[in-house]
Amino acid sequence: MFNFIDNVQTYSKEALQAAKYIGQGFMVTFDHMNRRAITIQYPYEKLIPSERFRGRIHFEFDKCIACEVCVRVCPINLPVVNWEFQKEKKKKQLQTYSIDFGVCIFCGNCVEYCPTNCLSMTEEYELSVYDRHELNYDNFALGRLPTMVNNDSMVKGIKGLGYLPKGIIEGHIDNQ
C-alpha cells in the first residue's frame, strides 16, 4: 500500500516538474511573440549603413598623382596603378587605375593613407554579380557615385545594423 502511495507521489512530482519546464518554454515563446519581426524584405527594405561603414571604394581620377601609396599599404597589393612619366612636366601621369572587389578585403588602408584624398569609402554594399570578372572595377566604374539608399523613394531604410536591444524593438523601420 505504501509502495503505491510513494509511486503516486513521485509520479505527481515528475508531472509537475515536466509541466514547469513546458510552461517555461511557453513563456519564452510568448516573450518572442510580443516582439516585432526583424526579418528584412531585401529588395524593398535595405540597411542604412553607419557613417564609418566600409563599402565600395570611390575613386577621383583628377586628384590622383600616381604615387602608389595605396598599393604599398594594401595588405594584398590590390590596386593596379598604370602611369607614364612625362618628361616635359617631370611628373607621373596616371593612365588607368583598377581594383578587383572580388579580392578586396575592404580594410580601408588605401583610403586612409592616400595623400590627395582621391579615394573614399561609399555606403554601397550591393556588389553581387554572376561573373567574378565583373568585380574588377576600372577608373570609370570606380568614379561612379553610388545611389543613396536614403534617396530611393521605393525603399524603406532600416536604422540599425543587426542587433536591436529588447527595449528598442518598436519603430525600427525608418518612416521617411
Swiss-Prot record:
PROSITE patterns (alphabetical): 4FE4S_FER_1, 4FE4S_FER_2
Membrane topology, from the record: Peripheral membrane protein
Domain 4Fe-4S ferredoxin-type: 55-84, 95-124
Annotated binding of [4Fe-4S] cluster 1, by residue: 64, 67, 70, 114
Any single GO CC term annotated in Swiss-Prot or TrEMBL for this entry: chloroplast thylakoid membrane
Gene3D superfamilies noted in UniProt: 3.30.70.3270
MF (Gene Ontology): 4 iron, 4 sulfur cluster binding; iron ion binding; NADH dehydrogenase (ubiquinone) activity; quinone binding
Top-tier EC class: translocase
Cofactor list: [4Fe-4S] cluster
E.C. code: 7.1.1.-
Single Gene Ontology BP annotation: photosynthesis, light reaction
Chain positions recorded as [4Fe-4S] cluster 2 binding sites: 74, 104, 107, 110
Coiled-coil regions, chain positions: none
Pfam families: Fer4_7
Quaternary assembly: NDH is composed of at least 16 different subunits, 5 of which are encoded in the nucleus.
Function: NDH shuttles electrons from NAD(P)H:plastoquinone, via FMN and iron-sulfur (Fe-S) centers, to quinones in the photosynthetic chain and possibly in a chloroplast respiratory chain. The immediate electron acceptor for the enzyme in this species is believed to be plastoquinone. Couples the redox reaction to proton translocation, and thus conserves the redox energy in a proton gradient.
Name of this chain's protein: NAD(P)H-quinone oxidoreductase subunit I, chloroplastic
Record lineage: Eukaryota, Viridiplantae, Streptophyta, Mesostigmatophyceae, Mesostigmatales
